[in-house]
Swiss-Prot record:
SUPFAM superfamilies attached to this UniProt entry: FAD/NAD(P)-binding domain, S-adenosyl-L-methionine-dependent methyltransferases
tRNA processing in keyword set: yes
Keyword Cell division: no
Span list, region FAD-dependent cmnm(5)s(2)U34 oxidoreductase: 265-628
Gene from which the chain derives: mnmC
Entry's Gene Ontology cellular component terms: cytoplasm
The protein's name: tRNA 5-methylaminomethyl-2-thiouridine biosynthesis bifunctional protein MnmC
Organism: Bordetella petrii (strain ATCC BAA-461 / DSM 12804 / CCUG 43448)
Catalytic reaction(s) noted: 5-aminomethyl-2-thiouridine(34) in tRNA + S-adenosyl-L-methionine = 5-methylaminomethyl-2-thiouridine(34) in tRNA + S-adenosyl-L-homocysteine + H(+)
Keywords from the named record: Cytoplasm, FAD, Flavoprotein, Methyltransferase, Multifunctional enzyme, Oxidoreductase, S-adenosyl-L-methionine, Transferase, tRNA processing
Cofactor(s) needed by this chain: FAD
Region (tRNA (mnm(5)s(2)U34)-methyltransferase): 1-237
InterPro entries: FAD-dep_OxRdtase, FAD/NAD-bd_sf, MnmC-like_methylTransf, SAM-dependent_MTases_sf, tRNA_MAMT_biosynth_bifunc_MnmC, tRNA_MNMC2, tRNA_S-uridine_synth_MnmC_C
Any one of the GO BP annotations: methylation
Length: 628
């Protein structure tokens, strides 16, 4: 997944016979006899559903070829109508050519059966921007999840992490779209199969059946649907060897039944994101923190969450994109003040040459314009409502967040309890780990402990004898920085959107605009001072093309502000994942300046693993952030 390839939208429409057809592949999306009938006959009954999911806590389906999502809607509808349904239903679906949201909504209004129209509307409401990678959608209060994998199946499938109970193989015909029926893809899909996994497909070509046999499935024909004589069903051969367990699978096993309280050390953005993700799944959480909720962020009036883009769409860019999407999904429903404000971000470059390079990068990446687009100086100023030094790019999903309100909201969820104390050492016991303070007093105990206490995690690991196998974590260091509060009326009320570049300037909160931020290498304390305020005023001037008179008259050292610490790791990526040498211990630290980007994503990543759900990141990104 290291080589980037832009998504190509589908060209589709009705042919002369009234069939919904792909122009590119010259094939129909579903039988003229009806999409719902095909989904029920081929994919549900072909996989023994709903009978097979009864008596289970969760059931996971993997699909090739999402199309308009009619198979997913039929599956979801069957789950809703079954009193003996599993508590959770998960689908992972691969789609190389996703529809844009408006197109998906329009086509579903025409093609989804009346019985599915309500569900189709919910799907369209949550449909993500057409960006490469994984997108997790949640329905029914999180009981039904859909993980969309946008991109080429051959590139995505080796990196998916899930435990699959049933496969819906629904690509276009093998002679029209051979990529979705290649033996290598079948092997990659089979790698995720549970011991009793089944499959079903309308396809019955000999090459398809042989590829499935070679991948470890026992296949047979049975009557097809909509004029097709046969379809193919299969079951995983019991003799199929288990794939080697990776660190994430071992971590899931170490968690046991998945009901015991999880201990989280740290009550900042990292710990709060993990606590929320676990609490939403009904998991009890104990958060150990030396200070009160968000006390470290008292005075941190506002912060920005903006994705990163890179010409090669590198891991940092892909992770930041995933993180911003998870943050918006997770936090949008919080109470006013705690919920982020989707105001957008203008990202300005330092000079005309860099601006041209950024515009060229956008052209190469071909991201949808409703997610990010290039803007000239006049359009940028119009979006911000204030004069700006130059143009740049505009991210529609840029979020303005109030950390001092967000963190207590996340830690205040039902099922989360807080313990005041400073963790000093971890002690291994028979059924997990104990967290002790420096006096040896027990603060918490559990089979699963997550260290989310920023730079403090390094000392905790060292004093527990767990740091030596983690040379990158051993290089983590604390970096001080400060922000400055500027009166919004001095800039005509302040910018309407986030303005970033060499520093940032945020829309006003309670009348104050945040300008930031400084980086104090080697500082002994994090403090607000005249030098830092002068730096932040200079950064604001660089973004605006000069300071307004009211701000130019301000005296550095006399302004309100906030100072704090960043935990920084080499490579500018966080460390998130299980510790292979200490089963049951997890790390979520090194968020640096992007705590908002990693908070919800890391929380969902850890919680999904502990609860046996499909992971919301591909394996190469899991490896990029793995503690080491």
């Amino acid at each position: 997944m290291s080589s980037y390839s832009p998504l190509v939208p589908p060209a589709a429409g009705f042919d002369a016979d009234g069939r919904f057809r792909s122009v590119a592949y010259g094939d129909v999306y579903h039988s003229l006899s009806g999409a719902l009938g095909q989904a029920e006959h081929v994919f549900l009954r072909g996989n023994g559903l709903p009978q097979r999911w009864r008596g289970r806590q969760a059931f996971t389906v993997c699909e090739t070829g999402f199309g308009l999502g009619l198979n997913f809607l039929a599956l979801w509808d069957a789950w809703r109508n079954d009193p003996a349904r599993p508590r959770c239903l998960h689908m992972v679906s691969i789609e190389a050519h996703p529809f844009a949201r408006d197109a998906l909504r329009d086509w579903l209004r025409q093609l989804a059966p009346d019985i599915l129209q309500g569900l189709a509307g919910q799907l369209a409401d949550q449909w993500p921007a057409c960006l490469p990678g994984l997108h997790r959608l949640e329905f029914e209060g999180g009981a039904v999840t859909l993980t969309l994998a946008f991109g080429a199946a051959s590139a995505l499938a080796p990196h998916l992490r899930a435990r699959v109970d049933a496969y819906f193989l629904d690509g276009f015909a093998p002679d029209r779209n051979p990529e979705l029926w290649q033996p290598a893809l079948m092997r990659d899909l089979a790698r995720m199969a549970a011991p009793d996994a089944t499959l079903a497909t309308w396809a019955c070509a000999g090459s398809v059946r042989q590829a499935l046999r070679d991948a470890g499935f026992r296949v047979r024909k049975q009557p097809g649907y909509g004029g097709k004589w046969h379809m193919t069903v299969g079951v995983r051969e019991s003799a199929q060897p288990e794939a080697p367990a990776d660190a994430w699978a071992l971590a899931r096993a170490a968690d046991g039944e998945g009901q015991d309280e999880v201990v989280v050390v740290g009550g900042g953005l990292a710990g709060a994101g993990i606590a929320q993700a676990l609490a939403l799944r009904g998991r009890p959480v104990c958060v150990i923190d030396a200070a009160g909720p968000a006390s470290a962020h008292a005075g941190h009036v506002a912060a920005a969450l903006t994705p990163v883009i890179a010409r090669d769409d590198n891991p940092r860019a892909r992770l930041s994109r995933a993180g911003s999407q998870r943050a918006l999904a997770r936090w949008a429903g919080l109470r006013p003040g705690a919920a982020p404000r989707r105001c957008g971000t203008l990202q300005l470059e330092r000079d005309a040459g860099r601006s041209a390079a950024l515009a060229e990068t956008l052209q190469q990446l071909q991201f949808p314009a409703d997610w990010v687009r290039a803007v000239d100086r006049d359009e940028a100023a119009g979006l911000a409502g204030v004069p700006l030094a130059r143009g740049g790019v505009f991210f529609a999903d840029g979020l303005l967040v109030q950390p001092a309100a967000l963190i207590p909201a996340l830690l205040g969820m039902p099922g989360v309890r807080r313990v005041a104390g400073c963790a000093a050492v971890l002690r291994r016991v028979a059924h997990g780990w104990q967290v002790l303070d420096d006096a040896g007093q027990l603060l918490g105990q559990g089979a699963t402990v997550v260290l989310a206490n920023a730079f403090g995690a390094q000392a905790l690991l060292r004093d527990s004898g767990l740091l030596d196998p983690l040379p990158r974590v051993a290089q983590m260091h604390a970096l001080a920085g400060e922000i400055t509060l500027l009166p919004g009326q001095g800039l005509g009320g302040g910018p309407r959107c986030i303005v970033g570049g060499e520093g940032y300037l945020l829309p006003p909160v309670d009348g104050w605009c945040v300008a930031g931020s400084t980086y104090e290498h080697g500082a002994a304390t994090a403090r607000v001072g005249p030098a830092g305020q002068q730096t932040n005023l200079g950064k604001a001037a660089g973004l605006l093309g000069g300071l307004p008179a009211a701000w130019a008259a301000l005296a550095p050292g006399q302004l309100p502000g906030w100072a704090g610490w960043r935990a920084v790791l080499p490579g500018r990526l966080p460390a998130v994942g299980p510790l292979g040498h200490a089963p049951g211990v997890w790390l979520a630290a090194g968020y640096a300046s992007r705590g908002l980007s990693w908070s919800a994503l890391a929380g969902d990543l850890i919680a999904a693993c502990l609860h046996g759900e499909p992971l919301p990141l591909p394996a190469d990104l899991l490896a990029a952030v793995a503690p080491r």
